């Protein structure tokens, strides 16, 4: 997984491999959520903020065959004191079809 900050958006790429299967040839949904959580957490990290995932919801829209390159992004939705709400999205890199998205809240360290 490669991640970087660009114009206040954390972007990244990830290509699931065979060991990431939930069942033959299809990427496990838990791994897709992990990729979304990682890009959202890195939005914090790359801005020198430290915290943890306090709550998260995920919506899966498409199956992801193993070997499919994904484009990831995380954006700030709202900030209230120590609570930051982010939106994460994952698309197939080749055609920008949305495969999964997450809305999550992160609690900053004190």
Write out the residue ranges for each language-model feature.
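Non-catalytic linker/capping segments at the edges of enzyme domains
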Residues: 1-19
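Hydrophobic beta-strand-centered segment that forms part of the acyl-chain substrate-binding groove
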Residues: 34, 38-71
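HotDog/MaoC-like acyl-thioester-processing domains
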Residues: 64-66, 76-110
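A short mixed-secondary-structure module that forms the rim of ligand-binding clefts
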Residues: 15, 20-37
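Residue-level recognition of well-ordered beta-strand positions that form the cores
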Residues: 13-15, 57-59, 73-75, 89, ...
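Hydrophobic core residues within well-ordered beta-strands of beta-rich domains
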Residues: 8, 52-54, 70, 84, ...
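Intrinsically disordered, low-complexity boundary segments flanking structured domains
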Residues: 1-2, 45, 93
């Amino acid at each position: 997984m490669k991640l970087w900050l660009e114009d206040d958006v954390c972007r990244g790429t990830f290509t699931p491999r065979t060991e990431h299967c939930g069942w033959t040839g299809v990427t496990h949904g838990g791994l897709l959520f992990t990729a979304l959580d990682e890009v959202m957490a890195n939005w914090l990290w790359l801005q020198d903020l430290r915290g943890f995932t306090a709550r998260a919801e995920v919506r899966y829209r498409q199956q992801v065959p193993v070997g499919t390159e994904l484009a990831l992004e995380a954006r700030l939705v709202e900030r209230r004191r120590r609570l930051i709400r982010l939106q994460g999205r994952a698309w197939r890199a080749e055609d920008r079809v949305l495969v999964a998205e997450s809305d999550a809240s992160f609690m900053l360290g004190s």
